[in-house]
Amino acid sequence: MNFFANAKENFVTESIDGLRRASGDPSIATLDGYPHIKVVCRTDLPSSKVAIISGGGSGHEPSHAGFVGKGMLTAAVCGEIFASPSFDAVLAAILTVTGKAGCLLIVPNYTGDRLNFGLAAERARALGKKVEMVVVSDDIAIPGIAQPRGVAGVLFVHKIAGYLAEKGANLATVAAAARSVAAKSVTLGISLSSCTLPGAGREDRVPPGQAELGLGIHGEPGVEMIDFSGAKAAADILCDRLFERVGKASGYALLLNNLGSTMLLEMGVLANEFLSSANGRKIKLIIGPSLMVTSLDMHGFSASLLPLTRDYITALTAPVAPRAWPSPRTPARLKRLKLPKEVKSTASKPSRNDAAAAFIAKSCDLLMALETELNALDAKVGDGDTGSTIATGARSLKSHLSKLPLADNPSLLASISDLLGKSMGGSSGVLLAIMFAAAGQALKAGVSLPAALQAGLERMKEIGGAKTGDRTMIDALEPALAALAGGKSLSAAAALARQGADATAYMTRAGAGRSTYVSSANLKGVPDPGALAVARLLEGLA
């Protein structure tokens, strides 16, 4: 697997430098200790304020370096990928940023981190520094374990301790608050994959159709494999287990964390499921969904809960400098406005025609059966969704059969236009809607059905800008409709559609559609998916 990196040994340091530059914060610096000592720190903290230091292995970005800045961390100590920073790197951070007010070390509970931060704390104390250390163990994946892992809940501790330190609280107060928050935070994660270490092969530990519950942020195996049945089930199992373990309160903060490669589209669905769940009304603040404590490219997410108090709400919602911290929000109630009446369906009165119903149903079945094949073909020359787009339109049309004006062809074509325009999406849905709408108008003028469809095709070409030879569905549709308008059989039309579709495989330049952005080498030998769909439909109907 390839990565956007240069030399492997410089992966972490170059990333730190790039992200630090992109932050635009002139008060953030790194210690001059590369490559062994990788410390990101503030330069503007008065010695009268408690310094907040955290860190651990890299590969969890933006944690922890991304949270350095006013209102959160004073320094972050970075190890190599999934490796604890050395004690002298931690000590260097302590000695650099700790003033007379002392410092608090916030340590996710992993053996290497705990030992190296602990040893550095002892050395710093021997040098006269006031140092407190809090170990965060928020992972509830394995019940009864002696040393639960520290995962995304550590951010609750960063934020609240950082707030108190910025306000000028003394070390004892900041440390006590941090310990209290750490003890109350609970986190659980679930993933559809492990993660890929740079230079190593991808591990396919999670079988298709399953998800791993409670795996660690270093890719450690989870507590169990479960059947995966979608976002709702995944959100429900995490929500149920978290609320079983978290302390009682009138409201909670939910931190919804992307573990690396989960799409924002997926994270939006998950946020909706958490907030719509039986316990959703108890969530008074939501942080994310966002990348916060990641595990390289892991396809999963974690959820963390913290019982809220008035003081916690104040601390969590206080503005901070680090851009990686997503401002907590009070969940909004869904508000829906009425559609303008002009946009509502223009459906005509339903009527019965068994032959038309059977013809449309068979057409829809033929198109739905092509979904996987067309998607695979489109993945080579487009964005891989032609089959799904066409199948969506076919499913919508078939599901509305009983509501269509089947005995009134002009109204039927207008209704098909309305349905396809609303259900299919993408350019193809709009183009077909244009064609059927124009065909319906032509039928009203008294022309035959094939001639009306030809008129619809001409309008589609006029508005869409494509023509025969541009490697689109028109290459199959135009000769087929011309044959039907000329009195030829459906079989003859299907044969011409097939010739047109096959010809697109030898067109090395596309004049319209997504394929216009694809190189000639990739187009060669691959027929246009839309043209093939037309040919296969007519062949199935002939």
At which residue positions do the language-model features occur?
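N-terminal loops that bind phosphate or other acidic moieties
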Residues: 1-542
